[in-house]
């Protein structure tokens, strides 16, 4: 069995990866800003094997050298820590762009210091570093060779895509410069059951839309993917020797209006949003090419109804709906 580091342990993707790795028998380290905040980290200790094989360490994405201790001696690093959705009235540079870009640089730099023992790094990037292009529709199906255009992101204020694109580019630069084995997973919009005590950014958006509290639903045409598939893709990226480069992890592409209709038909008692945002730039019809992940042995992706059912049912079980 191996010892792995998963950054940002309380995050949606990270917590599921930790749970899966522990169930597989691995030893896991994870980093959070405050390991003593039981309200946020307590649920991690409930995972099977956590008390015997989980360590929670302190680290900060924006502090250089912060990950040195956590990385030292592990076999592999899953760098998943990243803000996703930040309220528009916040300082985007400070709360979104810097943590993504500086965080990636800091984690990769810590990995370079331990490269004698470190076998592989798996970085969680995003389809947002692929699909934000002026020619997204014409170039579809988009594959691992496509990159988002930072100028497109700036024009339409797509700051998450902007930061993820620059952050991933920086990761590849450092990996090449330092001779690190890097594999990148590019998931689309991740959906599935809530694992932690409170919904995090993407699930919080779905909950607000289901409760009619968002004011409008996003004018997004985006790929969606079940959290179980994202976790499986990360483990495959780490443990499959043939895995390399970027790996798109995405099920169906749909506009949010289709998702609203899907959920409203299944759950007619909830006041789903009726109004679509008029924000432009994130609504280009496109498709994603997932041949690469299937060639590595990945099975079939879960469907839109499965992922949203699992999400809504988890909200119901936790008394949020």
From Swiss-Prot:
It is found in: Cytoplasm. One of its GO terms (biological process) is sporopollenin biosynthetic process. Its main location: cytoplasm. NADP(+) binds at residues 4-28, 40, 160. Disruption phenotype: No visible phenotype under normal growth conditions. It comes from the Eukaryota. One of its GO terms (cellular component) is cytosol. Keywords: Acetylation, Cytoplasm, NADP, Oxidoreductase. InterPro entries: Epimerase_deHydtase, NAD(P)-bd_dom_sf, NAD(P)_dehydrat-like. The keyword Signal does not apply. The modification N-acetylserine is found at residue 2. SUPFAM superfamilies: NAD(P)-binding Rossmann-fold domains. CDD domains: FR_SDR_e. One of its GO terms (molecular function) is oxidoreductase activity. Its EC number is 1.1.1.-. Coiled coil: none annotated. Belongs to the NAD(P)-dependent epimerase/dehydratase family. Dihydroflavonol-4-reductase subfamily. PANTHER family: NAD DEPENDENT EPIMERASE/DEHYDRATASE, TETRAKETIDE ALPHA-PYRONE REDUCTASE 2. May be involved in the biosynthesis of hydroxylated tetraketide compounds that serve as sporopollenin precursors (the main constituents of exine). Acts on tetraketide alpha-pyrones and reduces the carbonyl function on the tetraketide alkyl chain to a secondary alcohol function. This is Tetraketide alpha-pyrone reductase 2. It comes from Arabidopsis thaliana (Mouse-ear cress).
């Amino acid at each position: 069995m191996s010892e792995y580091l998963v950054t940002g342990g309380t995050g949606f993707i990270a917590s599921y990866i930790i749970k899966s790795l522990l169930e597989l028998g691995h030893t896991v380290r994870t980093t959070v800003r405050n390991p003593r905040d039981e309200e946020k980290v307590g649920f991690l200790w409930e995972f099977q094997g956590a008390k015997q094989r989980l360590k929670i360490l302190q680290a900060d994405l924006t502090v250089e050298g912060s990950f040195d201790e956590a990385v030292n001696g592990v076999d592999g690093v899953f760098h998943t820590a990243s803000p996703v959705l930040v309220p528009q009235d916040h300082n985007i540079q400070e709360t979104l762009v810097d943590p993504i870009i500086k965080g990636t640089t800091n984690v990769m730099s810590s990995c370079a210091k331990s490269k004698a023992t470190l076998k592989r790094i798996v970085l969680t990037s995003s389809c947002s570093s692929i699909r934000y292009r002026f020619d997204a529709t014409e170039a579809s199906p988009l594959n691992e060779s496509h990159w988002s255009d930072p100028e497109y992101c700036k024009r339409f204020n797509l700051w998450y895509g902007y930061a993820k694109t620059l952050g991933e580019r920086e990761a590849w630069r450092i990996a090449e410069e330092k001779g690190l084995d890097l594999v990148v997973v590019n998931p689309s919009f991740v959906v599935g059951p809530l694992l932690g005590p409170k919904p995090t950014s993407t699930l919080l958006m779905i909950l607000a839309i289901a409760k009619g509290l968002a004011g409008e639903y996003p004018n997004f045409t985006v790929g969606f993917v079940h959290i179980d598939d994202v976790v499986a893709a990360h483990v495959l990226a780490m443990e499959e020797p043939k895995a390399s480069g970027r790996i798109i992890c995405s099920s169906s592409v749909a506009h949010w209006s289709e998702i609203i209709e899907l959920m409203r038909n299944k759950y007619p008692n909830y006041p789903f949003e009726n109004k679509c945002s008029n924000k432009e730039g994130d609504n280009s019809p496109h498709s994603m090419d997932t041949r690469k992940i299937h060639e590595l042995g990945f099975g079939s992706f879960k469907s839109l109804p499965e992922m949203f059912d699992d999400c809504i049912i988890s909200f119901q079980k936790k008394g949020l709906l």
